[in-house]
Amino acid sequence: MQGQAQQQAYDRGITIFSPDGRLYQVEYAREAVKRGTASVGIRTPDGIVLAADKRSRSPLMEPTSVEKIHKTDDHVGIASAGHVADARQLIDFARRQAQVNRLRYGEPVGIETLTKNVTDNIQQYTQVGGARPFGVALLIGGIEDGSPRLYETDPSGTPYEWKAVSIGADRSDLQEHLEENYTEELSLDEGVGLALRTIAISNDDELTAAGVDVATVASDTEEFIELTNDEISAYIADNDLEPAEETDSE
């Protein structure tokens, strides 16, 4: 009973390490990320690709009300997995940081600088009493000094830079697919195709344009662009991800 009581104390105390050096609330926040639908980020020489599974919970839900990818500044976007409300708070914070940088220095914020500002904010919520960690992971992708940069944040407040990465549900399967198929010579179009094929692994239903968000940031224009449903449908068709047509059996 005493051991169980000690376990509960470490569970409830966000700022208390367990005897084996664990912060249980941060670990639980990571579990919340795993319950979210998948998002994928891919870095290519031509730019950044962000894709996110945004399947709605009901056919009555308006698909446009589900947002998984957000424009943060002209040259950077963020995809999320986990608690949507937590993601919204962090994305609003990131947007404010980007605006402050433009007002103060007259130039776009660096992707690495923006990521570290966001992760510093996340990390504070692992040390402050009366709060809880953010139950969300983010992919922050954009162009910095003409070069594509792609970062992941997790609930501990740790930033990681990647060439290709997935967050959310079925991460191990999606990451394995990326490791097997990613090359550093991918074009931006090929990156979109790889991102959609990766998302399809986590999607039990057929992949549709209404069920996925895709955005790119090209190196030459440094412009964040969200793909339209028609453009996504064309990529789905080009990558043989369309639902198979049913044939009548005699």
Swiss-Prot record:
GO cellular component: cytoplasm; proteasome core complex, alpha-subunit complex
Domain of life: Archaea
Record keywords, A-Z: Cytoplasm, Proteasome
Subcellular location: Cytoplasm
Record GO terms (molecular function): threonine-type endopeptidase activity
Keyword set includes DNA-binding: no
InterPro entries with a match to the protein in the record: Ntn_hydrolases_N, Proteasome_alpha, Proteasome_alpha-type, Proteasome_asu_arc, Proteasome_asu_N, Proteasome_sua/b
Record text on activity regulation: The formation of the proteasomal ATPase PAN-20S proteasome complex, via the docking of the C-termini of PAN into the intersubunit pockets in the alpha-rings, triggers opening of the gate for substrate entry. Interconversion between the open-gate and close-gate conformations leads to a dynamic regulation of the 20S proteasome proteolysis activity.
Example GO BP: ubiquitin-dependent protein catabolic process
Keyword Cytoplasm: yes
UniProt cross-references to PANTHER family, sorted A to Z: PROTEASOME SUBUNIT ALPHA/BETA (PTHR11599)
HAMAP family: Proteasome_A_A
Assembly, per entry: The 20S proteasome core is composed of 14 alpha and 14 beta subunits that assemble into four stacked heptameric rings, resulting in a barrel-shaped structure. The two inner rings, each composed of seven catalytic beta subunits, are sandwiched by two outer rings, each composed of seven alpha subunits. The catalytic chamber with the active sites is on the inside of the barrel. Has a gated structure, the ends of the cylinder being occluded by the N-termini of the alpha-subunits. Is capped at one or both ends by the proteasome regulatory ATPase, PAN.
Function of the protein: Component of the proteasome core, a large protease complex with broad specificity involved in protein degradation.
Family membership: Belongs to the peptidase T1A family.
Protein name as catalogued: Proteasome subunit alpha
Lineage: Archaea, Methanobacteriati, Methanobacteriota, Stenosarchaea group, Halobacteria
